[in-house]
Amino acid sequence: YCRYPISHRDLEEMLAERGISVDHTTIYRWVQCYAPEMEKRLRWFWRRGFDPSWRLDETYVKVRGKWTYLYRAVDKRGDTIDFYLSPTRSAKAAKRFLGKALRGLKHWEKPATLNTDKAPSYGAAITELKREGKLDRETAHRQVKYLNNVIEADHGKLKILIKPMRGFKTIPTAYATIKGFEVMRALRKGQARPWCLQPGIRGEVRLVERAFGIGPSALTEAMGMLNHHFAAAA
């Protein structure tokens, strides 16, 4: 569900066509339960090897008829770094988002350059994080509009996944669903490719399955692939 632009009801019908009876409310509960857990378990795999030039921006997500702000960061290649859904657009929200993106990163993994729009909230947040020692004082803050084209294009691809939802009811349910969307986007970009033993979507499926303890382990799978290769070559 989190990989494709489809509603819960449409997925219910598609499963029914294949003889599987699942109510759309059950699919909704599955997403709420497993999307955040998937994001948690796979975070180590897709949050690796970022370019030191980061692009920060926010896009709008409608929750109960009101706009909320989805803060997002990608590197200059377009790889997803992190995201954070906030009810407000403020220096406090920007700081919380950037602090989340920096959390757990080694010194050499932190950005050398941050490019944002001209919203003053980013400048205030970056200044505070530098003062607290969470961001290097040498980190450059740029406000070059065209450099953010890559993240604005990425917003559009994420919005394609969000559109069938036709709005969310609460911020927690919106955030839970978006976590699933963001993880699937990161996998489609190839950010976890080094840990996928098989090419394409099959490798991504097996990575998710292994994260939840489903199917053979990575070692067993790799040995099986080697045995198959040698048998085919014989």
Where are the regions that the model predicts?
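Charged, often Cys/His-bearing segments associated with DNA-binding zinc-finger transcription factors
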Residues: Y1-K62, K92, R96-A234
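A short, conserved beta-strand element enriched in hydrophobic/aromatic residues
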Residues: L70-V74, D79-R89, F97
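Short, flexible loop/turn motifs enriched in small residues
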Residues: V63-Y69
